[in-house]
Structures are given as C-alpha cells and as structure tokens.
Swiss-Prot record:
Coiled coil: none annotated. The keyword Repeat applies. It comes from Nematostella vectensis. Keywords: Nucleus, Repeat, Ribosome biogenesis, rRNA processing, WD repeat. Residues 226-245 are annotated as: Disordered. This is Ribosome biogenesis protein WDR12 homolog. It comes from the Eukaryota. WD repeats lie at residues 101-138, 140-184, 189-228, 259-297, 299-338, 344-384, 388-416. Belongs to the WD repeat WDR12/YTM1 family. InterPro entries: G-protein_beta_WD-40_rep, NLE, WD40/YVTN_repeat-like_dom_sf, WD40_repeat_CS, WD40_repeat_dom_sf, WD40_rpt, WDR12/Ytm1. It is found in: Nucleus, Nucleolus; Nucleus, Nucleoplasm.
Amino acid sequence: MADVEQVQVRFFTKQKKYEIADTPFSLSANIGHGDLNDLINGLLGAGNVGQSIQFDFLIDSQYLQDTIQKHMKAKEISAESVVEIEYLEKHPAPQPDNILVHDDWVSSVSRCKNCIITGSYDNCVQIWDDQGSCLAKVKGHTSPVKDVEWVSKDEQKGVFLSSSQDQSIRVMEWSIGSGEASCVHVCKGHTQSVDSISINPSATKFCSGSWDKTLKLWSAVVNPEGGDEGENGSLSKKQKTTGVKKKATTRTPLMTFTGHTQAVSSVVWMDRTTICSAGWDHCIRLWDAESGVNKQTLTGSKVFCEIAYSALNQCLASGSADKYIRLWDHRAEDGQVVRGILTSHQGWVSSVSWSPSNQFELASASYDTTVKIWDTRSPYTPLYTLTGHQDKVMCVRWSSSRHLMSGGTDNQLILY
C-alpha cells in the first residue's frame, strides 16, 4: 500500500452509552491514538463536562498502536475502502487493594464466593475472607503445597483440595465459622511432587499432574463415612454397614494417564470429557477423561509452566520458560494451532489465567516480578503491567471479572 494523506473511516462501539452518529469521516492517515481519542471525546461532548474519557481503538480486531497509515500498511488494508474503527473505554490499571502476608512462598491461590485459599511453601493451606482476615491455617502436608482448588462451598461447609511435594493430595472439609478444617481423604499414588490439580465441571472428579510424568484421575466426592474409595469408586461393605466415621482415609486413583516423558507441570479440565496437560517435555496433550486415550498432542519448543483454558473462546493459553505466552486453537483444521504469541515478559511465564467474563482478556505472572493483563488483540503491548511484587510471581488468578490475585516468592498474596 502506497502512502496516502487522507483515509475514509467510520467509528463504531459496542458500548451504547458512547455511540456516535454512523457517519464516515475523512481523516489524515498520519494520526494515531491521541488524536482519535480527542476526536471521539469532541463528538461526545465529553471534553466540556470535566475530564475526557480515555479510549482504545481497534481496526479489524487489532489494537491500533501506531498511526492509521502504518497500521493499514502492516495489515495490507486497502486505502480505497472505508476503514472501520472500533473504540472502547480504557479502564484504569488495577491497583493493589490488599496484601496478605505469608510465612513462605505463595505457590497457588483459588477463590470461591467470598473465600480465598492459598498454598504455601510453609507446608500449609490458609483460608482468607475478602477483607484479608485469615480464617484458618491448615496443616498436614509434610512438604511445600504446590496447588489448591475449591471443590464446593455453601453456608455450612467448604471442600477443597491441596497437592504437595510430599506426593499426596488432601481432600479437606472446612466447617465454616469454626476456624478448623479436617482432612477427609489423602489421595496417594504419585511417586513425586504433585504440582497441579483441576476439578471437573460437575465437581465430582479431579485430575492431578506430577513430576512422576503421569496424570491421575480421582473422585472428588466426600464420603460421609470417611471411608476409603479405591479404583472401583466404592466403600467397603464393613464401612457401609457400621457407618463408622474414619478421618483421613487413603484414596487411590481411578485412572492413570501416561504419555509425557518429563514432569507434568499443569493440568486443566476443558470440558466434561476432555483433560489437557502440559509438561517439561515441551508438549501439551489432550486426553479423553473416560478412556484415558491421548487424543491430541501439541508440540512446543520450551518447558511449559502452566496452561489455561477459556470456555468463552475455546482456546488454550500457555506460559513458558522462553518468556512467551502462546495462544492455541486445538480445533484448527489448517494446522496452524498457534494463533498468537504475546511478548513482553522478561522471565519465565509461571502462570496464566483467562478472564471469566471477557474472551479477549488474559492475566499472566512471571519470574520478572510482574503481573500483566492482556487483550489478546494486542499481542505486543499488554493493557497493564502490575509491579507490586518484590520477587518472582508464582501464580495469578481472577477472583472476579475485575479483580485479580497473585502470589509469589516475596511471601505475599496481592489482591488487585
């Protein structure tokens, strides 16, 4: 595309309160974000009623980072056409709202309703409320806790999982208001550290990934008798008839998935029948949760630290040791399964988490001490870089559509 002085543009937005007339404009091709922002504010009359509104702009679903002309040349957009420019309000960067101090590194975090659980290298799980008060500190593991996950929570009790370098997963039951949580089942079967756990959509089963190179499938159902549940998923006859409650009974896996050749670093339940795993063997694998068959393998070039799946866009995101975040579409029929690469981190990308309400929004955590929030339509520039941590960030999760949680080796969980 040759350089042009003027372009025809039409503005539109999906935010009804900021709609303007559907009228084409003839604009200089050399204007960028700032001039467009002034133009939209002028058309809305916002500049006359206090502080102007900040907007972002997209052309063909890609963020405008430069002038209109440079964007059109890069994307090979014809100068003869009317350029459709979408604008949307730019929200201010999230700010730290609270800091929850731990005794050791914070490896993992999970939120359910108004309660947060964290896993730490002090071998403990802690339960917190939204205001940052510690409701319970749960001991039991003999090595650092690597992952935590809520199973369920109601007015009376909460059930959650914790996995550890001690090779076990504990199914815990918390009596709300008592400050106490008891271990109902200890899940044993892995022979090395259990680094990742994920619950299925119906909260009846969960999977685990370990440094022993395997995934295992387990029952997440808490037996009232506290009895041992094994491969057949049933209680012993004696336990059924006597009704004797036995705490912390051993639970064995329902199934073992083999195929990874190095440590399994991350597992996620994609839907009712599909589990996804990633590992240090540079592979992402999709498994049939019923049969244990490895349905598909996606190959990368570096160690995978964590994967996340979005039901909104049906895509996977991966964080890797090469500092990059990759977006994967396992359904791609053209063979191009990598749909995008997000570049900005300066260290290992240790954790990734999709927004629960926005199919384009992704959070990432890195050993470079930062948390970043991305719109996947802007692969080279994150929306925000959050710099509250003083050391490596090990985990990040959305607690709601507009709130984040991150934990790291500075012994802090930061709520944004």
